């Protein structure tokens, strides 16, 4: 029998889709909802399920940015064949994404027992939500927002890509929140910071989902819940991406800062009152 029902999978897929690319921590929200539904957040199958449904959200990014991805991969392919093409920004950007993914892969493999153990606690999630809000507020205030997407460099990609480790070690910090905050501190404008966060998330999140797939299928999560959760995640994430890009073009990140604090405080309250367990 599956530890997650189809109905629960649909709810979790919607939560994943809404929050994966918003700087509010999809992992944190998934753990909160899992706790409220009585699903053991540290169960190996549940952790695997959460990673797999991320693939639906990543598929939404691939579809939404299909033309950009084809352009970048085409430039990369031309550069591999022709040295003259290697000065093209898209060719270099493709390599930057690859290099920037290496740190999170190494840390993820080395620290997997810790990540799926003590650091999976909802107390850690609550604290990370609040701490991350402070970092995001400071980054949005201190960043000069003067550099566009064409101004990104190898240094930018490596620093932003490496910042994903914060969310890996401290669920609740938010991968998107960490990457967007780092990009803002590097003076990228909000739209450029958001798009860079999307592109850097593609290999890391896809790899995590595929890596966990065999475990999720083998230890208590059925194919039907996985399919339902992933499909819902895709549909909702696509809408979330479109909304976020329009939002950051005209607004600051203050709304997300306030929301994170409220959710973090609420989670501390629920844990303290014993409504949900850590």
Question: Can you annotate each of these PLM segments?
Answer:
Residues 1-278:
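Multi-pass membrane proteins that catalyze or facilitate reactions on polyprenyl-/lipid-phosphate substrates
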């Amino acid at each position: 029998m599956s530890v997650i029902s189809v109905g629960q999978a649909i709810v979790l897929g919607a939560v994943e889709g809404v929050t994966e690319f918003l700087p509010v921590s999809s992992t944190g929200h998934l753990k909160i909802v899992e706790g409220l539904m009585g699903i053991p957040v540290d169960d190996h199958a549940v952790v695997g399920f959460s990673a797999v449904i991320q693939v639906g959200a990543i598929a939404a990014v691939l579809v939404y940015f299909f033309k950009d991805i084809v352009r970048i991969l085409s430039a990369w392919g031309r550069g591999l064949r022709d040295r003259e093409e290697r000065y093209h920004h898209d060719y270099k950007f493709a390599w930057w994404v690859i290099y920037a993914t290496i740190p999170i892969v190494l840390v993820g493999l080395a620290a997997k027992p810790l990540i799926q153990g003590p650091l999976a606690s909802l107390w850690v999630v609550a604290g990370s939500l609040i701490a991350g809000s402070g970092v995001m507020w400071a980054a949005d205030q201190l960043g000069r927002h003067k550099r566009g997407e064409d101004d990104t460099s190898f240094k930018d990609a490596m620093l932003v890509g490496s910042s994903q480790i914060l969310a890996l070690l401290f669920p609740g910090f938010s991968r998107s929140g960490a990457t967007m905050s780092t990009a803002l501190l590097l003076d990228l404008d909000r739209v450029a910071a958001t798009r860079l966060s999307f592109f850097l998330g593609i290999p890391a999140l896809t790899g995590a989902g595929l890596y966990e797939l065999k475990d999720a299928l083998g230890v208590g999560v059925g194919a039907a819940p996985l399919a339902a959760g992933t499909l819902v995640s895709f549909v909702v994430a696509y809408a979330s991406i479109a909304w976020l890009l329009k939002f950051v073009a005209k607004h600051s990140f203050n709304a997300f800062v306030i929301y994170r604090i409220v959710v973090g405080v609420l989670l501390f309250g629920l844990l303290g009152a014993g409504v949900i367990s850590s």
